Swiss-Prot record:
Record function comment: Catalyzes the last two steps in the biosynthesis of 5-methylaminomethyl-2-thiouridine (mnm(5)s(2)U) at the wobble position (U34) in tRNA. Catalyzes the FAD-dependent demodification of cmnm(5)s(2)U34 to nm(5)s(2)U34, followed by the transfer of a methyl group from S-adenosyl-L-methionine to nm(5)s(2)U34, to form mnm(5)s(2)U34.
UniProt-recorded Gene Ontology molecular function terms: flavin adenine dinucleotide binding; oxidoreductase activity, acting on the CH-NH group of donors; tRNA (5-methylaminomethyl-2-thiouridylate)(34)-methyltransferase activity
Cellular component GO terms, alphabetical: cytoplasm
EC number: 2.1.1.61, 1.5.-.-
Catalytic activity: 5-aminomethyl-2-thiouridine(34) in tRNA + S-adenosyl-L-methionine = 5-methylaminomethyl-2-thiouridine(34) in tRNA + S-adenosyl-L-homocysteine + H(+)
Record organism: Shewanella denitrificans (strain OS217 / ATCC BAA-1090 / DSM 15013)
Region tRNA (mnm(5)s(2)U34)-methyltransferase, residue ranges: 1-320
PANTHER family: SARCOSINE DEHYDROGENASE-RELATED (PTHR13847), TRNA 5-METHYLAMINOMETHYL-2-THIOURIDINE BIOSYNTHESIS BIFUNCTIONAL PROTEIN MNMC (PTHR13847:SF283)
Keywords: Cytoplasm, FAD, Flavoprotein, Methyltransferase, Multifunctional enzyme, Oxidoreductase, S-adenosyl-L-methionine, Transferase, tRNA processing
Official protein name in the record: tRNA 5-methylaminomethyl-2-thiouridine biosynthesis bifunctional protein MnmC
Cofactor names: FAD
Gene Ontology biological-process entries: methylation; tRNA wobble uridine modification
Length: 754
């Protein structure tokens, strides 16, 4: 009987079981021999024709499509193929950016999806979508709840796959400016499939989701409507939506049409892609607006750029967005903005990029997990996978980035840490693509050196050279849009400028933008002016008047560089125990790091160097290879990482803390403050009143020790918000990332601020 730490390889669910989940006839790919699958060929041709029509008729440079159900995933490949063909046939579509939102109640891994696609012949030499299929599978889609974003074709195709409860995932998305134009509903989402759920649940190991949450219902359709344009279409496949005679719970065509009409979808069809009337009913459209306003009221304490409460101020692609900071956060944001065609000016105080905390030679990349799989844990799983995709995309274009996706082995190093790790392992049925428990023997085989205790292994983790990653992001950004990097450019102060005052932007041109501009200063001299400014300056992010109260602290970290020799040279995975140790890179390992709050200096410290040399010996006192860690040559690097108490990064609008405190004091000084229900009224005020912010000033920081894992997704979400798009994280997570969260938590609970 294996112990709880011994790993037994999990095989993907049998193809026969997966095929039973996806209704017969759904596999839509047109095979080479159409006689063997004429229905699939007809379906896929109609789907490609539909996608081609919608792509060619797109009225904006941004086209957002929704899909209820992932199914066997072939439909996303057909959209991808259609986009490539349309761009080839119509050069004017080169600027079109397509965003596909997929909502699927039953999670499926990349390994299982690969198994399905292999059975369909999608990887065959004569398959027109083989390159796309291979690229998507390499993205390591995992069986986790929430969104997983895939950025493809130089940012021209973004696919968000949302696994989990349909209604919850839809409800948790903030209403965007760029709303869904068309919805495509796959057959298995229309059926309750009660009998199937009862007989196959144990085999499929699906999340225990109620049957009626897995199908279209009125509540789900209303949330789809909230996210949609007024004239958005809802397409249904009539043949596959027809319930069997034995299924009394399945939805009928008439029921679907009625529900779609009530939710305000102007065009729908029980027959494949045959659109009906374009007329819009004022009543359901009014209901949609009410739903949007309700969400806005619920989330008022968490201001989002370009939301209903903070009306979008037109920013042309030619108007440069300023990013202050040349580390991993600023570089990732520049890339995400460039993929959207935005001009960027990045100010870096150093003479080279990535010279702060990003300057370490090797940094571990793996998710932070908690026993209860909290929002923090879910965010880091999403972020880790997205960061990995970013890395692979840059490597595919031959950008030089030192890295090794060699896995990460986590072990305890004392009784407390061992108990904590065991609690994490036992807390959830973790997807194998995220992490799995290993015995000491298995850990030793993975690490290449002897490990005498069990551990938790992250197979898709590893290490990345942070500064090379950051520089590659910026080089890629420069190839996509007007991105300028200004080195040796210290910004010590930012002040609002009146719009009617002639001021030069970063390119030396007089800005014509309406509204307030931000002036960037150093030693009293203006360096530039921009309509939108993002502070992503790492350890100096709280050096500005507007951000000095942000609740994050600087921690010094000294990482020691040790020569690769002896048994240590055999190490081939990252070890995280009391500190971390990397495999060799250019004949040198990294071990560390120290953790000193509010450091007085960043000079080399002999004591910290010695402590680093002891970390692995303390973790594995009975083993010999840690003795090969030699720190005597005083080779090390020191940086400061900004850490928040709750371990979430800070991303979003810069809060106006003075105004928050002023309003708080005014409310407390009110004559009604002594009334019994006044505290509840104050809580309601803070819940529903837009929280004060510095308009068009944003924060991206507080990445702590896991910036390599969290920065790319946090930057992508901020870029999406700045451009009025749907971000790939929930409203709840956005609130947890918001820089004002420490104050809002107290105010929403009726607690005193000080």
């Amino acid at each position: 009987m294996p112990s709880c730490y011994e790993h037994s390889a999990q095989s993907p669910r049998p193809l026969s079981v997966l095929a039973e989940y996806f209704p017969k006839g759904y596999s839509v790919f047109y095979k080479a021999n159409t006689e063997t699958c004429p229905e699939a060929n007809q379906y896929s041709k109609a789907l490609v024709d539909f996608y081609t029509q919608e792509l060619n008729q797109a009225e904006d440079t941004n086209l957002t499509l929704g899909q209820m159900g992932l199914g066997d995933g072939v439909s996303l490949l057909l959209l991808w193929q259609s986009l490539l063909q349309c761009r080839k046939n119509n050069p004017e579509l080169s600027r079109l950016k397509v965003h596909l939102l997929i909502f699927e109640p039953h999670a499926i891994s990349a390994l299982e999806l690969k198994q399905l696609w292999q059975a369909l012949g999608l990887f065959d030499a004569n398959s027109p979508v083989a390159p796309q299929a291979e690229q998507f599978i390499a993205g390591k889609m995992a069986q986790i709840n929430g969104a997983q974003r895939f950025i493809l074709e130089q940012g021209q195709l973004r696919i968000d796959v949302h696994f989990g409860d349909l209604h919850s995932n839809l409800t948790e998305l903030m209403t965007p400016e760029h709303r869904v134009t068309h919805w495509h509903c796959l057959p298995h989402i229309a059926h309750t499939q009660t009998e199937f759920a009862e007989t196959q649940a144990s085999q499929l190991q699906f999340n225990q989701v109620q049957s009626n949450a897995n199908q279209l219902n009125q509540a789900i359709l209303w949330q789809m409507g909230r996210l949609s344009q007024d004239n958005a279409s809802l397409y249904l496949d009539g043949e596959n939506f027809k319930p069997s005679a034995s299924d009394n719970n399945a939805l009928t065509d008439c029921t679907l049409i009625k529900m779609a009409t009530q939710a305000g979808f102007s065009r729908y069809s029980p027959n494949l892609f045959q659109a009906s009337s374009d007329s819009c009913n004022a009543i359901p459209l009014g209901e949609r607006r009410a739903l949007r306003q309700q969400q806005e009221n619920r989330q008022a304490h968490c201001p989002v750029p370009n939301s209903l409460g903070e009306r979008r101020q037109a920013v042309n692609n030619s108007d440069s967005i300023a990013i202050i900071g040349g580390g991993i956060a600023g570089a990732c944001l520049a890339l995400s903005l460039a993929e959207r065609g935005k001009a960027v000016t990045l100010y870096c105080k150093d003479d080279k990029l990535g010279d702060g905390a990003t300057g370490n030679r090797q940094g571990a990349i793996y998710p932070l997990l908690t026993p209860e799989n909290s929002h923090l844990s879910q965010f880091f799983q999403q972020a880790f996978l997205f960061s990995r995709r970013r890395l692979l995309a840059l490597l595919h274009e031959v950008y030089p980035i030192g890295h090794q996706l060699c896995g990460v082995l986590q072990t305890g190093f004392d009784e407390r840490s061992e108990a904590r790790l065991e609690k994490i392992i036992q807390g959830q049925h973790w997807p194998e693509e995220i992490a799995y428990a290993v015995s000491p023997e298995q850990a030793s085989a993975l690490a290449g050196v002897s490990i005498d205790k069990p551990g938790f292994y992250y197979p898709n983790g590893g290490w990345i050279c942070p500064f090379e990653f950051a520089r590659a992001c910026l080089e890629k950004a420069k190839s996509l849009a007007n991105v300028e990097v200004k080195l040796n450019s210290t910004i010590s102060c930012i002040k609002p400028l009146a719009a009617n005052v002639d001021s030069k932007d970063a390119s030396g041109c007089t800005s014509q933008a309406s509204g307030t501009l931000w002036g960037l200063y150093h030693q009293g001299e203006i360096v530039g002016s921009h309509q939108q400014v993002v502070l992503a300056s790492g350890a100096s992010i709280t050096a500005f008047e507007q951000t000095q109260a942000l609740q994050m602290s600087g921690f010094r970290g000294q990482v020691s560089h040790v020569p690769s020799k002896g048994e240590l040279a055999k190490l081939n995975t990252v070890i995280c125990a009391n500190g971390y140790l990397t495999p060799a890179f250019n004949s040198t390992h990294c071990v560390g790091a120290s953790y000193v709050k509010d450091p007085e200096h960043l000079d080399f410290c002999s004591d910290e160097q010695a402590e680093n040399g002891q970390k692995m010996q303390q973790s594995f006192p009975n083993l010999e290879w840690p003795q090969d860690i030699d720190v005597s040559d005083r080779n090390a690097r020191v940086g400061v990482r900004m850490v928040t108490r709750d371990h979430f990064p800070m991303m979003g609008c810069a809060p106006d803390i003075e105004e928050i405190i002023s309003r708080y004091q005014t409310l407390n000084a009110s004559p009604q403050a002594s009334q019994n229900n006044y505290a509840k009224q104050c809580q309601q005020y803070w819940q529903q009143t837009p929280a004060p912010v510095h308009h068009n000033l944003f924060v991206l920081g507080g990445l702590g020790s896991r910036g390599l894992s969290s920065a790319p997704l946090a930057a992508e979400c901020l870029a999406a918000q700045l451009c009025g798009e749907i971000a790939p994280i929930s409203a709840t997570t956005l609130a947890l990332l918001n820089p004002n969260r420490m104050w809002m938590r107290k105010l929403l609970k009726g607690k005193a601020l000080c």
